[in-house]
């Protein structure tokens, strides 16, 4: 089989610009004409269900898998099929079996996946889908999460729902999103605790992140001096806690009466160990505001739509405890990340985050 030839076409493979020099099969189990494998591609580990040609067929043939590669952690059995794939742009593969959602993680890293870790500790929060179980395997003495199951909650993708309101108002939905985000943050703070670090430490991390982005997109270098000045203006102690880490409209589901936050793995480009560190909850707030701004730039959407939605989200989240200076810092950080992404992937879109960068720096 030629995994190297096919994996470069998969959305979950994030190293498309790198030449594949080595593919090592770490674990495998055959199921008729397909094989479930953990394959180390260069330095990263991926879970695949491949045919004889090395092409991944997990979404189409998952019913063939009776038990996976790992140990199942749950009071109940692994859900039986038939499975219906949830289509969409995902870095993992999610399927539905009755009232259960099964998520196969694709890029496998050491440690309990934060999607499992966080959600299993806040099952009573009404704005998340409770975890039912997960499967993991031990490699080199460390646990690696392979699969998780959650209660399936039907809903509409938050991004798609937002775009259906472009000729009207998204304000009430945004307010509900703010309330949902605050509810999840409070639940995580209660369960995992809070801490604080000097503002200088936060600034150092943001500057290091910016320098990494400049390596990816040298065009950002002209904004470095001004951005560093904004970061260095932070003073005092910054409150930290466990957060979502990659919150945007597409990481939410709109049900009949509320919003559900999904995919708590954090920013995919960051190492898993880094994604599990406490961070400011305003990083999540900034991520959602940036997502609203993107939606506000689509055809038919008016500037007023975005402004009203932003205000409503902050009202729902609770502005009494919100540090506007710190929020602006995280908006700048997110927008700089978006500029680097758009330069390398969708240059026609770079004006959207670039406007946000200039607005904060002005």
Predicted regions and their residues:
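Short Lys/Arg-enriched alpha/beta "domain-start" segment
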Residues: 1-27
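Active-site activation/catalytic loop segments of kinase-like enzymes and analogous catalytic loops
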Residues: 259, 266-318, 332-349
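Catalytic-loop of the protein kinase fold
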Residues: 242-245, 249
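Active-site catalytic-loop/activation-segment of kinase and kinase-like phosphoryl-transfer enzymes
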Residues: 194-232, 309, 340
């Amino acid at each position: 089989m030629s995994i190297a030839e096919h994996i470069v076409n998969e959305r979950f493979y994030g190293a498309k610009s790198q030449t594949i020099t080595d593919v090592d099969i770490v674990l495998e189990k055959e199921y008729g004409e397909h094989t479930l494998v953990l394959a180390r591609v260069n330095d990263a580990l991926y879970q695949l269900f491949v045919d004889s040609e090395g092409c991944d067929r997990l979404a189409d043939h998952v019913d063939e898998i009776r038990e996976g590669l790992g140990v199942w952690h749950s009071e109940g059995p692994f859900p039986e099929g038939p499975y219906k794939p949830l289509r969409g742009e995902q870095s993992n593969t999610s399927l539905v079996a009755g009232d259960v959602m099964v998520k196969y993680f694709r890029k496998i890293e050491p440690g309990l996946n934060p999607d499992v870790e966080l959600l299993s500790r806040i099952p009573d929060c009404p704005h998340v889908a409770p975890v039912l179980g997960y499967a993991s395997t031990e490699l080199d003495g460390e646990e690696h999460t392979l699969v998780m199951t959650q209660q399936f909650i039907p809903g509409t993708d938050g991004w798609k729902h937002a775009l259906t309101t472009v000729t009207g108002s998204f304000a009430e939905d945004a307010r509900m999103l703010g309330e949902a985000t605050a509810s999840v943050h409070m639940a995580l703070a209660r369960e995992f605790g809070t801490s604080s670090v000097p503002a200088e430490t936060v600034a150092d991390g943001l500057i290091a992140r910016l320098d990494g982005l400049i390596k990816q997109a040298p065009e950002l270098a002209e904004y470095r001096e001004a951005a560093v000045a904004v970061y260095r203006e932070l003073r005092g102690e910054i409150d930290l806690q466990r957060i979502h880490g990659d919150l945007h409209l597409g990481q939410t589901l709109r049900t009949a009466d509320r919003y559900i936050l999904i995919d708590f793995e954090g920013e995919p480009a960051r190492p898993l160990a880094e994604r599990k560190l406490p961070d400011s909850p305003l990083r999540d707030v900034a991520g959602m505001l940036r997502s609203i701004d993107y939606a506000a730039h689509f055809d038919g959407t008016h500037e007023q739509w975005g402004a009203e939605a932003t205000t409503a989200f902050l009202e729902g989240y609770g502005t009494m405890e919100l540090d506007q200076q710190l929020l602006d810092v995280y908006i700048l950080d997110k927008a700089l990340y978006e500029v680097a992404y758009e330069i390398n992937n969708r240059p026609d879109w770079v004006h959207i985050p670039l406007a946000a960068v200039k607005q904060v720096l002005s």
